Amino acid sequence: MRRHTAIVIIGFMVLATGRLPAQAEPGSIDARRELARALVGAWLPLESGLAVSAREGTPLSAKYEIEDGAFQLSVYTWKADTVSGDSFTEVIVDFSTGLVARVDTITGGNDLAAAQRQKATMARAKRSLGEATADAVRANAGYRAVSAMPGLDGSRPLAEVTLVRGDEWKIITVRLD
């Protein structure tokens, strides 16, 4: 168990070094436990949330999270507009109905910077984040996706998909090219 914990901590440290635009999952053990408990009540797989959010734009990243005490599925999307320029949104998908609950425009700060980096990565991708996430879940029976974040390894686009099964967490790297 200690070895598994060490591997998870190292994975979090890799994410914190800046290779990816944002941390994919909560850092503390208590936060991970709380998120894992909340996921039990969410029937909607992350990869389905990516598909649902696609009506608002191209999905750039997705994560189940607890924000301000509320459990939610958040997906960043991007939509090209030749007249007004690119637009970025955070789509909150209702995990109990599988419908879009809310769409918020991302206009500045760290969220906009992260969305722009994610767009640059996904522009190099030959496959969608949803496909990569589904592949990671299929290859890891019994696990479900908690987050999917695009990043670059040099110039190669990839997705880091965080998976959970009970209290076991792992991060899978999936190529997007």
Regions found by a protein language model. Give the residues of each.
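Long, terminal "pre-/pro-" and other extracytoplasmic accessory regions
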Residues: 2-6, 18-177
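Bacterial N-terminal signal peptides
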Residues: 8-16
